[in-house]
C-alpha cells in the first residue's frame, strides 16, 4: 500500500462534467468495479458524490498501468489525470459524458472480497447487510439518503435561525418522570442507588427555557424510548424540537407550514400549497377511521345509523339499542376485484382492530350477494343505497359497534387495506393536513384511570376548562398533529402556564400532590416566577426523511439503526459488561431462567 504523498483531491467524482474537459485533476475514492479489456483498463471510481470512469491505456505510464492491472473492487485509491469527453456516453451515471485518463495512481488500501455485491440491484439478507453496515452504506441507494438527511438538517437549522429561534442543547442525563413510554435508565456511580433516565423528549426542559426568557428555541435532539420496535420506531431516534413564547396555535402552525414549504421546495423542487387543511380529530376519525388520515384517495366512512333505526336485523338492532352506531364505506367499482374470499380477509382486518365482524353487499350485474340484506326491508335497502350512493359494481362494507371510535377505526384499516391492494393511492402525491382538537384525555382500562393523550402539560380548550375534573372524557386539547399521506410526521400543543390549572390536570390524572411534586416539582416551582403563554411541537426527523425520500422504512435513512430486538448487529450492542464495572455501579444482576 502507498501513501497519498503530495497528491490532494481537487475535484469530487460526481461533480465533474463536460465543462471540465481538458482539465488536470486529482480524485480519490473506492473502486466500484474494474474491467480489463486487453490493452485498456476501465475502472469506476466512487466517492460520496458519485462515480467517475477512469481509463488506463497504451499512453498510460507503464508503472501506472501495472498498478491498474491489480485493481479490484473496493480498493481505495487516489489518482491524477486529464478529464476528456467520453466517446461512448452513458446516462446510467451523472458523469457519463466524461472520463479521466489517469497519469498517476496510488493504491492507498486493498480490500478483501465483500460478502455481497455493492450495487443497488441486489437481493441480500437484511441481517447480513446490517452486520456489514459499513459496506451497505457504500451502495448509492443507501449512501444518498444519509447525505440528503444532512442537507435536510441544514435547511431546518437555517429556517429556524432566520425566524429568531435559538438552538439550545438540553441534557441527555435527566430525571425519570412518569406518563410516557419506558425509560432507558443509567445508574449513577457517584450517587449509589440513583439513576438518570435518557430523555424521551426535551419536553420539560424546553418549557423551562420559555420560562427562562429565550422566547424561541429549537434543537435537533436525540431521544430514547424503551419500547417494542415497529416498522416506524427505533429505541433511539432524532427529533426536530421547537418551542415558542407569546404565540397561539395558529402562529405555530404558520411557522411550521413555512418550514415544510421550504424543505419540499429546496429538496424536491415541489411547491407545497399552504395553509394546510385543518381537520378536527372527531372528523378525522369519523371520515377516515384514523387520527392520521391518508387523504390521497376516497373510500370515506359514512354514518348510516339512521338508516337502521327500528331495524329487525338483530345484530344491528342490539347495537343500536345499546346506543351504538353503524358505519359504512362504499368501495366503488370494486365488485369484480373484491371476491367473497377477499371480503373475508377484509373481515379479519376489521376484527384485528376490534370489530365483531364485517357486513357486506356486492352489487354485480348478475345480482347482489350480501351477508345481511335478506334481513332488511325494501325501505332499508333503498335508504342504504341512497346514503352510500350505491350502484352496480360497488361493494358496501359495514361495521356496527357500541363505540363509534372502534367502529371507525376498524373500517379505517379496511379502507387502507383496499387502497393499498387495489392501486388507489397516488405515490407521487404529498397530502398535508393538520389534525386538531384532540381529546385531552384517554381512558386506560389497564391502569384504571384517565391518561393524558399527549402529556400532562397540554392546554385544554377554553370551553372545556370547567370539565377537566368533572368530565375528562368530554375535554379537548389545544393540540395539533401534522399528517402526511397517513403518517403522523409531527405534533405539538399549547402548554399550560397557569399553576392552578396544572395542579388540576395532575389531579385529574390521578397524581397525588406529593407524586406531582416529586416528578415535576422543578417545573411547578418555575411557574411561580412568571410563565409566558407558550407552545411548540416536534417532528420525528427519521420519519420526515423517510417520507420525503419515499423510503419504506426509517432504517433506510438512519446510518446505524437498531433491529427488532433493539440490538445493533454491526457492533454487537447491547453487550455484557465485566464484574468490576457492575461493582463500581453497585449493581447485582438477577437473571431469570
Task: Tell where the protein language model's regions lie, with residue ranges.
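Class II aminoacyl-tRNA synthetase catalytic cores and aaRS-like
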Residues: 1-593
